Amino acid sequence: MFNAVKADMPDDPMLARRYGQCLELALEACQDTPEQFKLVETPLKSFLLVSNILPQDNRPWHEARSSGRVAEDDYDFSSLALELLPLNPRLPEEWQFGGQGWSSRMEPSQPEMGMGLCFEVFDGDLMRIALAWNKDEVIGQALQILAHSQTWTSLVPEDPLPWMWALFYGPRSHCEERHCVYAAARGKRGPILLPTAVYTPCANIEAFLAHLTRCVYALYLDVRDWKGEDIAPPFDVSRLNKMAKQLCLLPQEPFCITRVCLLCLLHKQNLNAQYKRPVDTYDPCLILTGEAERYMVDAVGNYREASTGTTVLYPTYDLGSIVADMVTYEDE
């Protein structure tokens, strides 16, 4: 056989030795399994190892069956003795042989799903609304839509203004973090982060009202008399007391709302990624999209769901740039 390596690269002993080893291995494979591998010398000074992916499997009983000489009943397996395990009486009847047994019918258990992460997506407009203390534009849009009678079907809040004021400007509408990033940057604690549906009443007024009532319920359920609160609403306090009575009419559904601002959540998300700390599943994982993607940095955090084994990646952001841009849209 012609040695192509020696002809092309005679001064490379390492390549020549590797060539010889590969060729020797190919010859051994062809000799051991001639029906699966064939070594072909090409006119281009090289060798081609051809493999048959589906080799012929000729077994004696296959030939006998194909020719019709031996039937399946001719094979005698009476000498085989396999020990059988006792039947589990706790299995459901339909799972037991013959349908006999005293067990009651059981439903197959559903696979347990992990809690996972709660993702919240914010574009540039939503991020500006979430960071701004002035929510008059959102309240004005909601009141304009609610001025029409067709939007008041089976709704609990007969007077929506106290509900919106309590959520956006109430005594429990500011961040409760010990070291608030918003307070360090702007001199006062930031507004708590709310579901995105609360910031866009024009998109779906029913979703806005549903989240509005649930958030107010979670924040102010224990407040019975608003006259004792140190507040100054732009309307009579009796409207807030009426709202407190209507809170008891809402269904007691579990609803969790974290009294944390957007900057503190982003800061916590950055720290989790930097120090590989476990992610708190009660805090949402924030994803900034649209024009807000420019705040994203190269560092990426990861979260592994223990029950499912899946790994989730989440981004980190430049808080300095976000705070610097807040000057243009956050009212003093």
Swiss-Prot record:
Keywords: Phosphoprotein. The modification Phosphothreonine is found at residue 42. Phosphorylation on threonine is necessary for the formation of the trimeric complex, for the expression of vPIC-dependent late genes and production of new virus particles. It holds the Pfam family Herpes_UL95. Changing residue 42 to A: Drastic decrease of expression of vPIC-dependent late genes and loss of production of new virus particles. No effect on early gene expression, viral DNA replication, or expression of vPIC-independent late genes. Part of a trimeric complex composed of BGLF3, BFRF2 and BVLF1. Part of the viral pre-initiation complex (vPIC) that is responsible for the expression of vPIC-dependent late genes. vPIC is composed of at least BcRF1 that binds the viral TATT box, BDLF3.5, BDLF4, BFRF2, BGLF3, BGLF4 and BVLF1. Belongs to the herpesviridae UL95 family. This is Late gene expression regulator BGLF3. The lineage of its organism: Viruses, Duplodnaviria, Heunggongvirae, Peploviricota, Herviviricetes.
